[in-house]
């Protein structure tokens, strides 16, 4: 078996569906969405045709801000710019779910699609504060 680096869970499921991978690691919620063709997989007819092998671990989601930030809670993200992960990624879906759970939508939070590396660079440079 050959190991390949990918963009994450959503990419892994798309690569698996396209038969570019034989085994993939993915977030459980995205596996379910791909199978049900909901969430970020709602418009993707080729997202099925796989089975689960094993559950690996419970995933922790982290919200990161600069040490000098006045943000102390998710509610403090109102009116801020937030990196929610790469477009159509598991990170984007989870970020939107978290913000929604706190009553925040794209009219209340400016959501930016950046991958981890770009979001970290922007955060470090102080261009905007939070990364979800």
Where are these regions (language model features)?
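Generic hydrophobic, aliphatic-rich segments that mediate packing or membrane embedding
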Residues: 9-12, 49, 59, 73
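General beta-strand structural signal in soluble alpha/beta enzymes
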Residues: 5, 26, 52, 111-112
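Alpha-to-beta junction loops
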Residues: 17-26, 80-82, 125-132
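Pocket-flanking alpha-helical
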Residues: 4-43, 119-122
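Bilobed "Venus flytrap"/periplasmic-binding protein-like clamshell domains
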Residues: 1-2, 55, 59-125
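Short, flexible segments with low predicted structural confidence
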Residues: 35, 48, 93-95
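Short loop/turn motifs at secondary-structure junctions
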Residues: 20, 49, 70-73, 127
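A structural signal for short loop-to-beta-strand junctions that line the ligand-binding cleft
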Residues: 43-56, 61
